[in-house]
């Protein structure tokens, strides 16, 4: 008798569920995608005990026809594909027809649905079998309740992480879906507490403000770009809001959240020299393309995709992020540990309302506003390497929604309002800001957040407010300031009417020299300095093999290396712009870079060499400067292409506004 037999449907579904339904967040993702595909404009997600006890998703989409209800829980039953060719033109989020079958095999599922001009129906499924199917009262759309997840697979239930971890993963999925579909009102409720609620205005930056808070939202920069095959749209946060992991990078293709190593790399390349090693940006990028250019049928979770013309897309993302920050003021503000008190308005108006301008006019041109509300000061959840939850008072968590940053302090405080009431210039400035915000909200030039970022912030005078966030004259990106002195022979202290500045002198000169060497290395020049006595270098046999392979690349950075016999090589000339006293050391370092990498990208080699040379030739710490030398250094920095970070991504200038200094000395409360 044969040993091979076809598996029972219930067993096959449980096996399939192992990939599709890994945890409660997988269920939320699949049901949310179904609701979006059904054309819903309002979706509510309610979970109890982080989805382990129950998950309920209610939408106002098209609903399911009565005759289709018997099929929706069958494997590979779907309304989204009909023939082979459809697999290459997928625009829906779901298409495999596996989700409901997999979910119903490991949970108890009740589904109510109603279409236009039809009576409602209810179906109950347990262990993959339909136990009840009857008419029922239901609103248009679908209401699906998933209970007792993994009740019949105890091994899977055993390995569910803590409730905090699972809730965090659910919130993460919903947050990303909300960002990619801002036109849908999405609410997430956990054990009766609202975790997220979007207004469906169609503005992604409003959703990001709801998720990441107003402080980040003020510093979002809009990006947009096209090629013949791709269109990208999104928001990138200023480098000062960088995080310690890649979790805050959100990439979507045709509205689908995906993970892709090359696109992550493109985003980091766009932030090149603006972020230090180990820091990652907050950003949202949606890529629109013909579905034929992307294969989403790689894995049942549909997170992995394969792209055509990936290099073209890579370059588009890099260039648009670089353009976004090219002429922008990126002086980070000092981060004071300041928590506002309740019931007292910091500014002269009762409650700041910030309205995000739509990138394009909506059809009804209905005015939407986003109100800043009081944020809660509470511990955030943080997950360690063992998936255990660690409570930290001051850590940031993407899973915790912050409607806005608080602008409110205690009525009983004194001194601050009295000071401000006497300051007519302050009120004049605030009025100008409000008028500018109003003009921004009423206009439709498509620039969104960048038109008002940093306006009406909880700082006193701030150069970012006065100069604007995008300078028409690149030389004015660094404000004019008076040199006051130097601290520890390392930091230059300067001031102007808006506050105090600290400048890292080594980082400043490193940026200046980096741009000089980078440009020189990239030039093709015949201007060389001949050596009376050639420099001689000795290499082992294996090193010789690498060097011989990359002789042309060395020539492109100005090093003419000639084999002199045996293990010896000579250099008889060098570019005139090489620092004369360091020629031999520079050449050694260049060759070592090649020997370490064992492969060479000429662009990266030029970059690494420029960074290396700039670091060695720059002013070191504990080096005291004359006042005119400090002033000259700031003037040179003002001419730099990117004057705010050193080549390694560390900040060059930090700004303390006048108000922040007053807070430090308790002159204001």
UniProtKB/Swiss-Prot annotation:
GO terms (BP aspect): mismatch repair
Family matches, as InterPro entries: DNA_mismatch_repair_CS, DNA_mismatch_repair_MutL, DNA_mismatch_S5_2-like, HATPase_C_sf, MutL/Mlh/PMS, MutL/Mlh/Pms-like, MutL_C, MutL_C_dimsub
A GO cellular component annotation in the UniProt record: mismatch repair complex
One Pfam assignment: MutL_C
Biased composition (Polar residues): 361-378
Keywords: DNA damage, DNA repair
Any one GO molecular function term: mismatched DNA binding
Residue span of region Disordered: 356-382
Annotated SMART domains: DNA_mis_repair, MutL_C
Top-rank lineage group of the source organism: Bacteria
Similarity comment: family membership: Belongs to the DNA mismatch repair MutL/HexB family.
PANTHER family xref list: DNA MISMATCH REPAIR PROTEIN MLH, PMS, MUTL, DNA MISMATCH REPAIR PROTEIN MLH1
HAMAP family in alphabetical order: DNA_mis_repair
Its biological purpose: This protein is involved in the repair of mismatches in DNA. It is required for dam-dependent methyl-directed DNA mismatch repair. May act as a 'molecular matchmaker', a protein that promotes the formation of a stable complex between two or more DNA-binding proteins in an ATP-dependent manner without itself being part of a final effector complex.
Designated name of the protein: DNA mismatch repair protein MutL
Lineage start: Bacteria, Bacillati, Bacillota, Bacilli, Bacillales
This protein's encoding gene: mutL
């Amino acid at each position: 008798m044969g040993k091979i037999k076809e598996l029972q449907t219930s067993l096959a579904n449980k096996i399939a569920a192992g990939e599709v339904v890994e945890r409660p967040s997988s269920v939320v993702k699949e049901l949310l995608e179904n609701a979006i595909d059904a054309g819903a404009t309002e979706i509510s997600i309610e979970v109890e005990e982080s989805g382990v006890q129950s998950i309920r998703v209610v939408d106002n989409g098209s609903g399911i026809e009565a005759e289709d209800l018997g099929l929706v829980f069958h494997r590979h039953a779907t309304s989204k594909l009909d023939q082979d060719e459809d697999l290459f033109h997928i625009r829906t989020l779901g298409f495999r027809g596996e989700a409901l079958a997999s979910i119903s095999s490991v949970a108890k599922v009740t589904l109510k649905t109603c279409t236009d001009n039809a009576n409602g129906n209810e179906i109950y499924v347990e262990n993959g079998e339909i136990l009840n199917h009857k008419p029922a009262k239901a609103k248009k759309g679908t209401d699906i309740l998933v209970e007792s997840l993994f009740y019949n697979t105890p091994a899977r239930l055993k390995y569910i992480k803590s409730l905090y971890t699972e809730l965090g993963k659910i919130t993460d999925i919903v947050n990303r879906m909300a960002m990619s579909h801002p036109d849908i009102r999405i609410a997430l409720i956990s054990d009766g507490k609202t975790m997220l609620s979007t207004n469906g205005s169609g503005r992604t930056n409003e959703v990001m403000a709801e998720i990441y808070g107003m402080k980040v939202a003020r510093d979002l920069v809009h990006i947009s770009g096209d090629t013949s095959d791709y269109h990208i749209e999104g928001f990138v946060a200023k480098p000062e809001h960088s995080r310690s992991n890649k979790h805050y990078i959100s990439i979507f293709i045709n509205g689908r959240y995906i993970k892709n190593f090359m696109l992550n790399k493109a985003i980091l390349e766009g932030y090149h020299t603006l972020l230090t090693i180990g820091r990652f940006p907050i950003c949202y990028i949606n890529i629109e393309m013909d579905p034929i250019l992307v294969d989403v049928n790689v894995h049942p979770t549909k997170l992995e995709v394969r792209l055509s013309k990936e290099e073209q897309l890579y370059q588009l993302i890099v260039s648009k992020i670089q353009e976004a920050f090219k002429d922008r003021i990126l002086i980070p503000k000092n981060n004071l540990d300041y928590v506002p008190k309740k019931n007292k308005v910091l500014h002269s108006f009762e409650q700041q309302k910030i309205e995000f301008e739509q990138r394009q006019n909506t059809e009804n041109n209905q005015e939407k506003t986003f109100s800043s509300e009081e944020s809660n000061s509470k511990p955030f959840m943080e997950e360690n390497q063992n998936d255990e939850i660690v409570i930290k008072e001051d850590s940031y968590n993407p899973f915790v929604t912050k409607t806005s940053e608080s602008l409110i302090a205690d009525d009983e405080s004194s001194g601050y309002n009295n000071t401000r009431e006497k300051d007519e210039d302050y009120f004049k400035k605030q009025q100008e800001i409000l008028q500018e915000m109003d003009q921004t909200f009423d206009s439709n030039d498509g620039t969104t957040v960048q038109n008002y970022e940093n306006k009406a912030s909880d700082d006193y005078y701030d150069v970012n407010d006065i100069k604007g966030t995008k300078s028409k004259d690149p030389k004015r990106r660094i404000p004019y300031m008076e040199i006051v002195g130097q601290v520890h022979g390392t930091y230059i202290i300067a001031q102007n009417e808006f506050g105090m500045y600290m400048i890292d002198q080594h980082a400043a000169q490193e940026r200046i020299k980096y741009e000089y060497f980078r440009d020189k290395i990239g030039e093709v020049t015949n201007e060389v300095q001949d050596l009376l006595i050639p420099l001689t270098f000795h290499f082992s046999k294996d090193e010789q093999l690498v060097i011989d392979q990359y002789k042309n690349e060395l020539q492109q950075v100005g090093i003419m290396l000639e084999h002199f016999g045996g293990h010896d090589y000579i250099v008889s000339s060098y570019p005139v712009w090489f620092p004369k006293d360091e020629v031999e050391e520079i050449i050694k370092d260049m060759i070592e870079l090649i020997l370490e990498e064992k492969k060479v990208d000429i662009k990266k080699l030029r970059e690494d060499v420029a960074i290396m040379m700039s670091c060695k030739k720059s002013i070191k710490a504990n080096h005291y400067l004359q006042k005119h030398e400090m002033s000259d250094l700031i003037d040179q920095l003002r001419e730099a292409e990117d004057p705010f970070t050193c080549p390694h991504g560390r900040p060059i200038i930090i700004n303390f506004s006048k108000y922040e200094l007053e807070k430090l000395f308790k002159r204001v409360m």
